[in-house]
Amino acid sequence: MSFTPSPVHLSRRTLVAALCLAGLGLASHSAWAAKPKAKAADGPFDMEAFNNATDAPLLRSGSQGAAVARAQIMLDRAWFSCGEIDGRFAANMQRMVRAYQTAHDLKATGTVTAETWTSLRKDGAPLLTTYTVTEKDTAGPFEKTPVAMDERAKMKALVYESVDEALSEKFHCSPGYLKQLNRGSIESGKQITVPNVAASATPVSAASIEIDKSERVLYVLDTAQRLVAGFPISIGNEKNDPLPLGTMAIKNEVKNPGFTYNPALLKTAPKDAQKVDIAAGPNNPVGSIWLGLTKPHWGIHGTPNPSNVGHSETNGCIHMTNWDAERLSTLAKAGFKVNVKA
């Protein structure tokens, strides 16, 4: 893996890079793991009941349902992102529950206990809200992301594949969960139910980043080294391009970056692969934002595959969901220290 910014490309918001995504990016945008398709509810979703629920069940790995989704939304708003909000308690949520508990002086069990519910509910804002779909939302353009890099290089922009995907990212949830909340197709003018992630309050202080390779988590610390935010990440494969231990710093930020696939810099690239430039866009291999690091060719960036984050290995760099990478960029500026530990 290598990421070599070019002054000419940067002036056009383009980065020269080798592949920094899981599985060489040669799988289709939607192909990672076969998951059961979410089924729409038989009747309209009861947003009021969801928002007014006061139950505090013990949630642990394997739990599913509305209570899990409520906890995920509150964790997201507290800046301890589970990645996609989907109503399923998996590894990312367990890590973030533990991080949240540590940050709030609770026993770090990794399970949502009664004490954790009490702490999370201090937020008070409704967990779900309504959103009226705009003409801009549905106008696109939307286009299927090709499998092959040379085919991606022919696209003018690596855009979303559908309005469902675009709105899912906007509201930090999986497309399947968005379908659970809303019956029928999404059209301009339609009022839909979405996670109320806009109610998130920015941490008052942030000074450095710590990356825990074993946990696959990026932590944000304040000046007193207290934990104020956490995000799931995917990192480089230990055999091909492992994330190095030690201290780096954020060097620059590029919004809506382009990408150059350079197989000569990849250990696992097909022998017949060609170097190609790929246009910017949310489904670009490095997503919607790039935070360059002082170690040459390395960066923290978004991804076109949010469901993979925290679960897959990459060929280098630090992958986050697009929305989490964008949120991180509001906290982490040039000069921010990035400490990587095993």
Residue ranges and their predicted role:
Residues 1-10, 14-28:
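N-terminal secretory signal peptides
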Residues 56-64, 81-87, 106-107, 150-158, ...:
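Second-shell loop/turn segments in exported
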Residues 63-109:
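A short amphipathic alpha-helical interaction element
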Residues 71-75, 85-86, 96-101, 163-171, ...:
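Short alpha-helical segments in extracytoplasmic peptidoglycan/chitin-binding modules
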Residues 91-137, 179-208:
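Extracellular LysM carbohydrate-binding repeats and other cell-envelope/extracellular binding modules
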Residues 198, 204-303:
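Gly/Pro-biased beta-strand-loop elements
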Residues 270-342:
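Exported/periplasmic cell-wall-interacting domains
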